[in-house]
């Protein structure tokens, strides 16, 4: 310590000015040479990763941290600029382009940089090894001749491991034989390989009609039932645009979706089909939504060749555009603009952000190309009808006037052309002009009192085990039904708009994992959702959809029901309806969904069949339902009161005032709300008693026809069925039943 202190006592500070002047003169020489004090891009600096402890979790979506020393940060006109103090902070010449600009990096180095910061959750299975193979191949640029003999020995292995070298074009890949696709449209080997790998051997009707027209450059307005493959109907032409484009950087497709979950689903689907493109550039197809770091998204957008296809929600994309004029200029050159679930995007209250995006891009495109609008526009949805957006409770079904079916799409198109800048009149492709709900969906109805909705949900999932998706109009109903089913020992999960996006995705993953386990055990798995999951989401294996409440509009009913019977599979949609709903809203819904405008009489009222209900089984479930409902109400009321009290205390502490309990009674609404919740609470002894009683009932087997005598008596030997595991898994004496088979057989008998 003494030498250091002595050095300080000698005041060596002023002496350091001499080397400072020398370094200043040297820096002037470097400035003259164009090598120092230049504004550098963040990607040109030697960032070092910071290890994040595993005990800290994922920071709620935090992907990683990097740091750098010896770099000055300057803010000029609101923009952050980096200035390196010395050349050691810059990337080595091997990582930079051989030229004058240190910001531009060569394509190989850029891709190494991309993979360095990539989130491991985004990497598909088997992709890491493929990327490492690609990196080693790029390092040995001159080794093609030495390894040619080995490659000739196995052409198939060469196709798999070396196809992504830049010496080989994507179109040179071997195309699989898919005559159903190639006989009707001209597709590249890249797309054909993706279709073959995913098992899409035949195009759907909407794909068959849309893709050739889109490849020819037409604007398209496409309508098809849910689960019919609309994503690939617009996705394949966009992927073909990337392959045929020579610039290797210009954006090709811009796709907008109404929800974040749908945007991620579309992105994953396009990446699977265009796997060869993604392997060549992992960020050629990007998803830009809220709930994720906007700084990381801005950074990824700067990589060379990134964001050739962007799937985005309007809010986040608008935020990115308005922060950076270069992004506006860049995406103004886009070839194709797509609106998925266009009817939802263009409804009142959802169009403002999209309209601002169009204004930004239109102005930039007009300035650069001298044209106001020049991109190809494609819009798709399962519902294009002005009647669908009317509230079912607003107008009487008797006063409704339905336009002729041949003019319906024309009427909607006139409405859309006032909002969307088409180049001309788009082609209308309607694969189901008379059919609103997919033909694979068998609809059914349960009539009950409003207070018995929970009971009949329990009855349905008990009698028909499988994967069931229940839709509610209110978030409170979602929470209550979730607690109710948990009390009945049924695997239930919830998803609604009040949940964080991270928790929504976790809930979906847990539901799918539990569904696989319960399928082997023949037990029910239930996902309870608000309308956040109604549009576009492709949740695999949904067998039944239950409308806990009648939807507020017909388009919501169509999209809810479309979560089952995906990709030509079959499914069941059940509506639980109270007498009040049956009088008006249900009749209006059936009238809107009628097949033809000129249908005679009132046959449309009888199109939906009643689900057969067995009263003896319902009577055995009623007491269980009452106890589970009371416990669920108590749990939710207790949790809600605790949150209200904590919020009030926190607000009072922030304001520096005392909380007076009498203040709550002065507000009539708060007082009534609190009283209502207090009335639902159960004391500890009552709650414990209810739980014990409920557990005793759950341990008592349910018997068909309430049989409690000898198992070996009667027409069927129940003991033999139990030992051989015949019959229903939860109800003794009941045959295995399937809701779809039951409704099919009932419809056949009705036709006879």
Curated annotation (Swiss-Prot):
Task: State what protein this is by name.
Answer: ATP-dependent RNA helicase MAK5
Which transformation does this protein catalyse, written as a reaction? ATP + H2O = ADP + phosphate + H(+)
Task: From the UniProt record, give one GO term of the biological process aspect.
Answer: maturation of LSU-rRNA from tricistronic rRNA transcript (SSU-rRNA, 5.8S rRNA, LSU-rRNA)
Please give the superkingdom of this protein's source. Eukaryota
| EC numbers on record | 3.6.4.13
Chain sites annotated for binding ATP: 224-231
The protein's GO terms of the molecular function aspect are: ATP binding; ATP hydrolysis activity; RNA binding; RNA helicase activity
| Start-end of Basic residues biased regions | 8-29
Question: Where is motif Q motif found?
Answer: 180-208
What function is annotated for this protein? ATP-binding RNA helicase involved in the biogenesis of 60S ribosomal subunits and is required for the normal formation of 25S and 5.8S rRNAs.
Q: Mind listing the UniProt keywords for this protein, alphabetically?
A: ATP-binding, Helicase, Hydrolase, Nucleotide-binding, Nucleus, Ribosome biogenesis, RNA-binding, rRNA processing
Task: Quote the PROSITE patterns the UniProt record gives.
Answer: DEAD_ATP_HELICASE, HELICASE_ATP_BIND_1, HELICASE_CTER, Q_MOTIF
| InterPro entries per UniProt | DEAD/DEAH_box_helicase_dom (IPR011545), DEAD_box_RNA_helicase (IPR050079), Helicase_ATP-bd (IPR014001), Helicase_C-like (IPR001650), P-loop_NTPase (IPR027417), RNA-helicase_DEAD-box_CS (IPR000629), RNA_helicase_DEAD_Q_motif (IPR014014)
Domain Helicase ATP-binding: residue ranges: 211-402
- Residue ranges of the motif DEAD box: 340-343
Top EC class of this enzyme: hydrolase
Per UniProt, subcellular location reads as: Nucleus, Nucleolus
């Amino acid at each position: 310590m003494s030498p250091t202190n002595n050095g300080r006592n000698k005041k060596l500070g002023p002496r350091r000015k001499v080397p400072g002047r020398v370094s200043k003169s040297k820096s002037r020489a470097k400035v003259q040479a164009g090598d120092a004090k230049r504004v550098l891009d963040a990607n040109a600096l030697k960032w070092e990763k910071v290890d994040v402890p595993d005990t800290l979790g994922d920071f709620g979506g935090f992907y990683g941290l990097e740091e750098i020393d010896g770099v000055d940060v300057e803010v000029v006109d609101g923009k952050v600029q980096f200035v390196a103090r010395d050349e050691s902070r810059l990337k080595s010449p091997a990582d930079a382009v051989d030229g004058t600009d240190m910001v531009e990096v060569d394509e190989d180095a850029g891709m190494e940089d991309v993979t360095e910061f990539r989130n491991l959750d985004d990497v598909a299975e088997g992709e890491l090894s493929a990327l490492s193979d690609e990196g080693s191949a790029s390092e040995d640029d001159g080794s093609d001749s030495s390894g040619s003999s080995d490659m000739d020995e196995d052409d198939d292995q060469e196709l798999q491991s070396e196809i992504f070298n830049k010496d080989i074009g994507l179109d040179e890949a071997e195309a699989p034989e898919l005559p159903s696709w190639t006989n009707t449209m001209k597709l590249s080997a890249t797309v054909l390989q993706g279709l073959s790998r995913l098992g899409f051997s035949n195009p759907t009707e909407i794909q068959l009609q849309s893709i050739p027209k889109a490849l020819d450059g037409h604007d398209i307005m496409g309508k098809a039932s849910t689960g019919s493959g609309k994503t690939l109907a617009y996705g394949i032409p966009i992927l073909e645009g990337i392959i045929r484009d020579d610039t290797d950087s210009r954006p090709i497709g811009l796709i907008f979706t109404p929800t974040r979950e749908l945007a991620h689903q579309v992105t994953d689907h396009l990446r699977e089909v265009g796997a060869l493109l993604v392997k060549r550039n992992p960020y050629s197809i990007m998803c830009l939504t809220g709930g994720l770091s906007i700084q990381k998204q801005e950074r990824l957008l700067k990589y060379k060749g990134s964001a050739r296809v962007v799937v985005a929600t309007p809010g986040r994309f608008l935020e990115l555009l308005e922060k950076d004029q270069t992004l506006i200029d860049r995406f103004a050159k886009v070839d194709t603009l797509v609106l998925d679930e266009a009817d939802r995007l263009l409804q009142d209250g959802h169009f403002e952000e999209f309209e601002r995006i169009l204004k930004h891009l239109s102005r930039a495109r007009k300035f650069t190309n001298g044209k106001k609008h020049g991109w190809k526009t494609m819009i798709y949805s399962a519902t294009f009808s002005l009647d669908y957006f009317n509230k079912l409770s607003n107008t009487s079904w008797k006063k409704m006037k339905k336009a002729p079916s041949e003019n319906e799409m024309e009427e909607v198109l006139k409405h859309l052309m006032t909002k969307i800048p088409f180049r001309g009149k788009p082609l209308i492709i309607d694969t189901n002009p008379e059919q609103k709900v997919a033909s694979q969906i068998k609809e059914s109805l349960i009539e009950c009192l409003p207070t018995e909705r929970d009971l009949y949900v329990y009855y349905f999932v008990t009698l028909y085990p499988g994967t069931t998706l229940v839709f509610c109009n209110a978030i409170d109903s979602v929470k209550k039904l979730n607690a109710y089913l948990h009390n009945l020992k049924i695997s239930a999960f919830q998803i609604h708009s009040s949940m964080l996006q991270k928790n929504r995705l976790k809930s979906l993953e847990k539901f799918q994992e539990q569904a696989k386990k319960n399928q082997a055990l023949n037990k029910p798995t239930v996902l309870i959702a608000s309308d956040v999951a109604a549009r576009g989401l492709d949740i695999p294996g949904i067998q039944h959809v239950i409308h806990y409440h009648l939807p507020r509009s017909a388009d919501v009913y169509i999209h809810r029901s479309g979560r089952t019977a995906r990709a030509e599979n079959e499914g069941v949609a059940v509506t639980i309806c109270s007498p009040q709903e049956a009088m008006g809203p249900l009749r209006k819904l059936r009238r809107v969904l009628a097949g033809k405008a000129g249908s005679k009489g009132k046959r449309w009222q009888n199109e939906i069949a009643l689900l057969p209900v067995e009263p003896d089984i319902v009577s055995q479930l009623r007491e269980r339902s009452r106890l589970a409902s009371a416990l669920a109400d108590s749990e939710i009321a207790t949790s809600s009161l605790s949150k209200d009290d904590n919020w009030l205390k926190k607000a009072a502490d922030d304001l520096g005032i005392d909380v007076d309990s009498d203040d709550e009674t002065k507000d009539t609404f708060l007082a009534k709300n609190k009283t209502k919740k207090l009335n639902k609470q159960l004391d500890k002894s009552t709650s414990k008693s209810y739980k014990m009683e409920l557990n005793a009932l759950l341990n008592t087997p349910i018997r068909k026809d309430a049989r409690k005598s000898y198992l070996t008596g009667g027409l069927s030997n129940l003991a033999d069925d139990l030992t051989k595991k015949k019959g229903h898994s939860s109800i003794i004496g009941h045959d295995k039943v399937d809701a779809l088979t039951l409704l099919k057989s009932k419809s056949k008998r009705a036709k006879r």
